[in-house]
Structures are given as C-alpha cells and as structure tokens.
A protein has these predicted regions:
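Conserved donor NDP-sugar-binding/catalytic core segment of glycosyltransferases
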Residues: 80-116
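Short, well-formed alpha-helical segments that are part of the catalytic scaffolds
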Residues: 1-11
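A conserved acidic beta->alpha catalytic loop
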Residues: 6, 24-33
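A recurrent flexible, glycine/aromatic-enriched loop bordering the glycosyltransferase active site
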Residues: 125-146, 213
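Non-catalytic, C-terminal membrane-associated alpha-helical segments of glycosyltransferases
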Residues: 99, 196-260
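Short beta-strand-to-loop acidic/aromatic patch adjacent to the donor-nucleotide binding site
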Residues: 69-80
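A short, conserved alpha-helix in the catalytic core of glycosyltransferases
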Residues: 144-146, 150-155, 160-187
C-alpha cells in the first residue's frame, strides 16, 4: 500500500498516461482487498500462489505488453519512491534515445547508504548516484525502466526463474546485446536491504534446514543457478558454481572463515 501511495502521489507524469499492474499471487493478508478499495484503477493479475517474484513480474509484464506501452517500469513493493522519481527516470531514458535500461538506486532510510541498483563492473561495489548517468553491471530489479525499443529486443523476464535470478539474467542478456545498463542520476527512493546471510548458507541452522532452504524457490535453487550460469558463462563455470554452492551449503562456516 505504501509503495502505491508513493507512486500515485507523483501521477500523472506530464505527457504520459500510466497504468499499474500488480500480481496477486494468492495473497491472504487482505492486501488485494485494500488495494482494490484504495486504488481501484490498479489492474490486478491473478497468480496461483506459486509465482514468487520473478514469475509474478513476468505474468504482470506479459499482461501489460499486450497493450503495447512506450515504457515499462518494474517497482518492488518494498521500494518507496521520492517525488519526481518516475518523471526524472523517463527523462534519463530519453537522454540516451531510449536505447538503454535505466536502473534506479535505492538507499536505506535509516542510514542513507546505497542498498540496491547497479554495480561497478570492476569492483563489484554498488554505484552511488553522482548527478550523471553511470554505466554499470548486475542490475537489481527494485526500480527498472525498460523502453519499448529495448523490450522489442529483449522481451520479458525469463519465466524459468521462480524468485531471484530473473533480474540478474535480464541484465546479462542486455549486456550481451550491447544494451547499456545506466544508473539514474539521483536516488529514486528508499528500500531497506534484505538479510545479509541467507538461511541456506547460515551456520546457525542445521544442515537439513539449510539444504531445504537452498532448494526452495526463495533460496538458491541449483537447477536455476546452473541454467543462469550455463547461459551466460558456459558449462565449465556452471558446473564449478553448482558444486561450490553445494559445498557452501554443507560447510558454511568454512566459507565465512575464508571470506574473512
């Protein structure tokens, strides 16, 4: 609800008509009813409870694409936009003739530090907005603006992925087609960072629970990981990371010791 409130507070955007699509993947906490009451114009796409983030986004985008919009904007429901963020992102896209993907950086409301966006291709660190468009790598799907021109080249998110991985895959597909990933000039809003250490690689949990978590759609499903790595890096690297991910799950404390 808060996410939608922030979106609608800056609509309409000058020169554009906007439609919002939201996937209801079997929600039982009353969100659908609340949205329908407060924002009846939102187009709700129904799921079966097994879509998770990526497949939910894929289904909503598929529905939206049937209308044929000039731009498509992904926004996570835990991302709260600053005033003018959408209009400024559209201007950034037009600045590069709508041939790049515009990614918005988010920051923690508590600390002001960067939480999601694009990374420096050399260092792997999150890029910090500096008032100019910056080319980066490894997009996060919190705020992503895709023009019709780019969509016609890349299409939708890959529904092979349940939850995570789809945004990473989309960014890599773009780079392989020489479509630039550009960080918007300023922070577009706030989003708090998720738990740093996932359950599947957290030594505080027993192996059985870690293994179950690893193979859940919200974990690091091995088949999806292999699919992603094989597509973009080839079989040798895919096989290597398949094995090391299993070892990471089985011996997480060793990984932590090596990292430090």
């Amino acid at each position: 609800m808060k996410c939608l409130e922030h979106i609608y507070s800056q609509l309409p955007v000058n020169g554009f008509t906007t439609d919002i699509f939201m996937t209801d993947d079997g929600c039982t906490d009353g969100t659908r009813e609340a949205v329908t009451t407060a924002f009846p114009q939102v187009r709700i796409v129904n799921g079966d409870g097994n879509l998770f983030w990526n497949r939910g986004m894929h289904k909503a985008w598929q529905e939206a694409a049937s209308t044929g919009y000039d731009y498509y904007l992904w926004i996570n429901d835990d991302t709260f936009l600053y005033d003018g963020a959408i209009e400024q992102a559209l201007l950034s896209s037009r600045e590069c003739s709508d041939t790049a993907i515009i990614v918005g950086a988010t920051q923690s409301e508590a600390t002001g530090k960067s939480t999601y966006g694009l990374r420096d291709a050399k260092t792997g660190k999150l890029l910090v907005p500096n008032g100019m468009l910056q080319e980066g790598h490894g997009l996060n799907g919190n705020f992503v603006l895709v023009s019709k021109i780019v969509f016609e080249q890349l299409g939708n998110l890959d529904s092979h992925f349940h939850h995570s991985g789809g945004d990473t895959d989309y960014g890599l597909r773009a780079e392989e087609r020489n479509i630039r990933l550009l960080l918007h000039k300023e922070y577009i809003g706030t989003c708090e960072q998720h738990q740093a250490l996932s359950k599947w690689c957290n030594p505080d949990y027993p192996l059985r629970e870690r293994w179950q978590s690893l193979n859940k759609p919200t974990g690091m499903p091995l088949k999806e990981l292999f699919y992603l790595e094989r597509r973009h890096y080839g079989y040798p690297k895919a096989c290597f990371h398949f094995v090391t991910t299993i070892l990471h799950c089985c011996f997480p404390k060793l990984w932590i010791d090596i990292k430090h």
